[in-house]
């Protein structure tokens, strides 16, 4: 089937009442055709796909807003897998096996980027299963990755571990306690195992990781976080040079492939390919390239993050944002008596787990 035939089917799906699994399958279709058509000389077909993807993003954002509160409170009965349940559902069951498990978390890593890298990964590893999960909101490292490692929503992290949670208005790295959150989650699941946690922020540390891999084979769980894709995503916004190198989504995937082909991460996978281990590759959240920014006016105390705003006296168009007056309603911590959250409506996204 070519895209011209698939176009009508996707259009009909978008007019229907899809559930979370059907949205995942639709997203997979759109990514498949985006990769297939990105090199096509027929730019008119690719433009049609881009418009269909924009429409899908709009509808998906509405779907997210309508269902999100029920999902996180498990009130719908058919909740998708969310960030805070990822490890307990997908990784922890494998820790009972008599072999080491390596969990590789690539910050801000999208599904289309994974599909672009998959052929290189499969030169060394066999992909046994590919799943997608839904990121919690806001889709930022501060919230999504802390939830992933803690196995709790941010509201509950602050409630249960107040000394470890760093609030929006506090100084310091908001993700500096991820390794402790992981230990706490393992303890809640009665898993007394040898675990290591590593955050790779530069090539030098990445190379040290390679040298240390033989020692990690003695542990039941080894977690390695890679931040390059997230840094690339931010540089794409802030640097003219990077913006030129990754001017569209196809070029962005190309930069990702180039990085991966020469990265210490690929060397890690090569090493693991000769060992009897479980390997999970996942992310904490994805990203969306915003073509039409939403204006939100706020006091100077409001958060500066581009994906969401929290603060007093926020002025915005309610049709353009997902607004929550009481943060605890979506299990986010309250900073003060007046701290509503506003998330741009057109930046919801799926995250994934391989």
Language-model-derived ranges and their functions:
Residues 1-354:
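Feature captures the catalytic ectodomains and active-site-proximal regions of enzymes
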């Amino acid at each position: 089937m070519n895209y011209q035939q698939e176009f009508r089917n996707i259009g009909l799906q978008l007019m229907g009442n899809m559930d979370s699994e059907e949205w995942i399958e639709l997203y997979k279709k759109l990514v498949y055709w985006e990769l297939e058509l990105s090199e096509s000389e027929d730019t008119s077909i690719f433009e049609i796909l881009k418009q269909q993807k924009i429409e899908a993003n709009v509808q998906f954002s509405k779907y997210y807003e309508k269902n999100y509160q029920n999902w996180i409170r498990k009130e719908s009965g058919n909740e998708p897998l969310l960030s805070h349940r990822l490890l307990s559902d997908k990784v922890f069951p494998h820790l009972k096996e008599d072999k080491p498990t390596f969990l590789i978390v690539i910050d801000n890593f999208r599904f289309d980027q994974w599909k672009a890298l998959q052929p290189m990964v499969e030169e060394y590893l066999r992909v046994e299963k590919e799943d997608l999960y839904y990121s919690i909101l806001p889709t930022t490292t501060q919230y999504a990755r802390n939830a992933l490692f803690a196995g709790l929503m941010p509201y509950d992290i602050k409630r249960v571990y107040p000394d470890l949670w760093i609030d929006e208005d506090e100084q310091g790295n908001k993700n500096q306690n991820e390794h402790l959150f992981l230990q706490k989650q393992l303890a809640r699941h009665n898993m007394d195992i040898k675990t290591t946690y590593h955050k790779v922020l530069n090539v030098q540390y990445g190379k040290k990781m390679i040298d240390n891999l033989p020692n990690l084979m003695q542990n039941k769980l080894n977690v390695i976080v890679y931040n390059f894709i997230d840094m690339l995503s931010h540089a794409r916004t802030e640097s003219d040079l990077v913006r030129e190198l990754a001017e569209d989504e196809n070029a962005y995937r190309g930069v990702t492939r180039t990085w991966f082909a020469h990265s210490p991460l690929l060397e890690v996978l090569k090493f693991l390919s000769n060992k009897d281990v479980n390997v999970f590759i996942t992310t904490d959240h994805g990203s969306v390239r915003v073509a039409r920014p939403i204006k939100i006016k706020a006091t100077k105390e409001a958060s500066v993050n581009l994906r969401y705003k929290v603060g007093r006296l926020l002025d915005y168009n309610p049709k353009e944002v997902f607004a929550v007056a009481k943060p605890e309603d979506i299990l986010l911590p309250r900073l003060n008596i007046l701290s509503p959250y506003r998330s741009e409506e057109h930046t919801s996204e799926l995250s994934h787990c391989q």
